[in-house]
Swiss-Prot record:
Keywords: Cytoplasm, Magnesium, Metal-binding, Nucleotidyltransferase, RNA-binding, Transferase
Main location: cytoplasm
Stored HAMAP family: PNPase
Cofactor: Mg(2+)
Biological process, per Gene Ontology: mRNA catabolic process; RNA processing
Originating gene: pnp
Enzyme kind, highest EC tier: transferase
Protein name according to UniProt: Polyribonucleotide nucleotidyltransferase
NCBIfam families per UniProt: polynuc_phos, PRK11824.1
Record InterPro entries: ExoRNase_PH_dom1, ExoRNase_PH_dom2, ExoRNase_PH_dom2_sf, KH_dom, KH_dom_type_1, KH_dom_type_1_sf, NA-bd_OB-fold, PNPase
One Pfam short name: S1
Length: 700
């Protein structure tokens, strides 16, 4: 195939799609250029599914090559290693809108690889990667119901910005990524500076309208490339098996879905499934039916049973109304030795969240393609297998945990103090101890409580809620505070976090087309009502940050010195600062602008270190009397230390009003004496006098 190129303007940027020249053995390959940011995105699909495959094995890997930014990796091996958190998050960003566009019965393995090969520091690789994945999938000749478009939206001074640069995002009140087909929004990921629901919805609509040009260009590219439609045909539905299944099940699935306890409901459904398999075992062999097919159809009946009951009765699995939030209990200060903690329970979802305060040096150094930077607000989310009553792998966080942690972090970021206002590194850890839906939003609520318990001056409490949707034709219901089953069997997962004033984070994943603006507006308004209710429950336990930090948290004292005096504080080979930290047990950070931060759990120790630094950096005043220690005896006088790092000479003639034959007769090293500063010359040499002090005292 000859090289094909398509170019279009997208916001301020020029986007080019190229295919037919590079990676020609992949099913689909596209080079995407957005100004100087260049990615190669490839798609390879297996010709057949593996025997017994019962899920769709789609993998997405996004990688930023260090050479893209003209850098060599800083690791020992000097090559790219395992995926960074950013790479994992962008991989998920690509995956989420394309996964629903494959047929349910398609089980062939599909792998998407997006490599950033040139990176303009002002243009991130996420949107080009999503566009490239959509184009490569469309060229691959597989049953993909795309293409999709993707756009990043900023908001400033009442105006939406299409695909803002990195610099523009720093000033923006919003960073929102939206992806979808020509007719439907499929995915939204965002963080916001407490914006209204209307502004958030407007950004989604604006982004979906603008991305249409991406979809049109990809359609044009695939048409010119002559991509043939996929010849994959879904397996025919086994009507006889479905009828037999319904006869054996009867009303037992419906009865099981009326059980309100999650584990009891799960056990009841499993018992029905086991009984069905046992009863139909003979017919499976006689009719030549497949067990995997039976299990698939059983899952389909689960799906239909729950959804039909919801639409018909407007009553949830656990007996709640559509808008009701599960019972909430809140506790703070649940762990005695940590800096801040909260226990947040909502129904059968529970999180213990802990806040730890550290100094600036505790921040995480990120070695990125564009250079190193330090992150001083860390949020870690852990989802152990026991939280859902299962055995499983424990330890290294999976992609889902990284994604949920980032969403929860976005939820509270808008209310966090700046490093200037609160110069601590803050680490929040959410331990999910029970889960039945919306654990990431429980993490938002728990983190708000833990931060306030730690005394972090957040601007306002934050809460989060997960919304769901069940839609059949024109009938639909929007669900507040969804359960795990409602998430799994529903059509939308819509998470909203914010304060009483506005939205701080919004994440949306939609599995079907036909979600209208009105449905999204209803979901946002219903989420606001739920969020305000949750905030009210949280306020009963703790409504504002504590006035004092934990006894076990480090206290920070900040002083400012002239940058020229930094070398005096550090001392020769670091001797002075090492002596201060060793003597006082404090941790001291010195910044280039002369800002010094002293950290210690002991307030008195911090004040002592501050006093010593002030002494070192203070100027010696002629005419002032100091108390000093004799540092060295010489034939012509004695050197006395009057301030740390500042020695002056008491000449033999200035030791006493009497004649002194030998300095050692009057002074010894280590003696503490009072001296008056006679002069500080141009070279900084200090002349001292003991005699002048005695004369001054005698005259009083």
């Amino acid at each position: 195939m000859a090289k094909i190129t398509k170019t279009f303007q997208y916001g301020k940027h020029t986007v080019t799609l190229e295919t037919g020249e590079v990676a020609r053995q992949a099913n689909g390959a596209v080079i995407v250029k957005m100004d100087d940011t260049v990615l190669l995105v490839t798609v390879v699909a297996a010709k057949t599914a593996r025997e017994g495959q019962d899920f769709f094995p789609l993998t997405v890997d996004y990688q930023e090559k260090f050479y893209a930014g003209g850098r060599i990796p800083g690791s020992f091996f000097k090559r790219e290693g395992r995926a960074t958190e950013k790479e994992t998050l962008i991989s998920r960003l690509i995956d989420r809108p394309i996964r629903p566009l494959f047929p349910e019965d398609y089980k062939n393995e599909v792998q998407i690889i997006a490599m950033v090969m040139s990176l303009d520091p002002e243009i991130d690789g996420d949107i080009p990667a999503m566009i490239g994945a959509s184009a490569a999938l469309s060229l691959a000749g597989i049953p993909f119901k795309g293409p999709i478009g993707a756009a990043k939206i900023g908001y400033n001074d009442g105006q939406y910005i299409l695909n803002p640069t990195v610099s523009e995002l720093k000033k923006s009140q919003l960073e929102l990524v939206v992806a979808g087909t020509a007719n439907a929004v499929l995915m939204v990921e965002s963080e916001a500076a407490l914006l209204s629901e209307e502004v958030m919805l407007g950004a989604v609509i604006f982004g979906h309208r603008e991305m249409q040009k991406v979809i049109q260009v990809i359609d044009s590219l695939t048409a010119e490339a002559g991509t043939q439609p996929s010849d994959w045909v879904p397996p025919a539905k086994n009507d006889a098996l479905v009828i037999a299944l319904k006869e054996v099940i009867g009303g037992r699935l419906s009865d099981a879905f009326h059980i309100r306890d999650k584990l009891q409901r799960r056990d009841a459904i499993a018992a029905v499934k086991d009984d069905v398999i046992q009863q139909l075992a003979g017919r499976l062999e006689v009719e030549g039916w497949n067990l995997a097919e039976l299990l698939k159809e059983f899952g389909e009946l689960e799906y239909r049973t729950m959804r039909d009951a919801l639409l018909d009765t407007k009553v949830r699995i656990d007996g709640r109304s559509l808008e009701a939030v599960r019972p909430i209990t809140v506790k703070v200060g649940v762990l005695p030795r940590v800096h801040g903690s909260g226990l947040f329970t909502r129904g059968e979802t529970q999180a213990i969240v802990v806040t730890t305060l550290g100094t600036a040096r505790d921040g995480q150094v990120i070695d990125a393609v564009t250079g190193e930077y330090k992150e001083n607000f860390l949020f870690h989310y852990n989802f152990p297998p026991y939280s859902v009553g299962e055995c499983g792998r424990f330890g290294v966080p999976k992609r889902r945990e990284i994604g949920h942690g980032r969403l929860a972090r976005r939820g509270v970021l808008a209310v966090m103090p700046s490093l200037d206002e609160f110069p601590y590194t803050i680490r929040v850890v959410s331990e999910i101890t029970e889960s039945n839906g919306s654990s990431s939003m429980a993490s938002v609520c728990g983190s708000s409580l833990a931060l306030m318990d730690a005394g972090v001056p957040v601007k306002a409490p934050v809460a989060g809620i997960a919304m769901g949707l069940v839609k059949e034709g024109e009938r639909f219901v929007v669900l507040s505070d969804i359960l795990g089953d409602e998430d799994h069997l529903g059509d939308m997962d819509f998470k909203v976090a914010g304060t009483s004033e506005g939205v701080s984070a919004l994440q949306m994943d939609i599995k079907i087309e036909g979600i209208t603006e009105e449905i999204m507006r209803q979901a946002l308004q219903q989420a606001k009502v739920g969020r305000l209710h949750i905030l009210g429950e949280m306020d009963k336990a703790l409504a504002a940050p504590r006035a004092e930090l934990s006894d076990y948290a480090p206290r920070l004292l900040t002083i400012k010195i002239h940058p020229d005096k930094i070398r005096d504080v550090i001392g020769k080979g670091g001797s002075t600062i090492q002596a201060i930290t060793k003597d006082t047990g404090t941790q001291i950070d010195i910044q280039d602008d002369g800002t010094i931060i002293i950290a210690s759990v002991n307030n008195a120790a911090a004040r002592e270190a501050k006093c010593r630094i002030e002494q070192i950096t203070s100027d010696v005043e002629p005419g002032r009397i100091y108390e000093g220690k004799v540092a060295k005896i010489m034939d012509f006088g004695a050197f006395v230390t009057i301030l740390p790092g500042k020695d002056g000479l008491v000449h033999v003639s200035q030791i006493s009003s009497e004649r002194v034959e030998r300095v050692g007769d009057k002074l010894k090293e280590g003696d503490v004496v009072r001296v008056k500063v006679l002069e500080v010359d141009k070279q900084g040499r200090i002349r001292l006098s003991i005699k002048a002090v005695e004369e001054e005292v005698a005259s009083i």
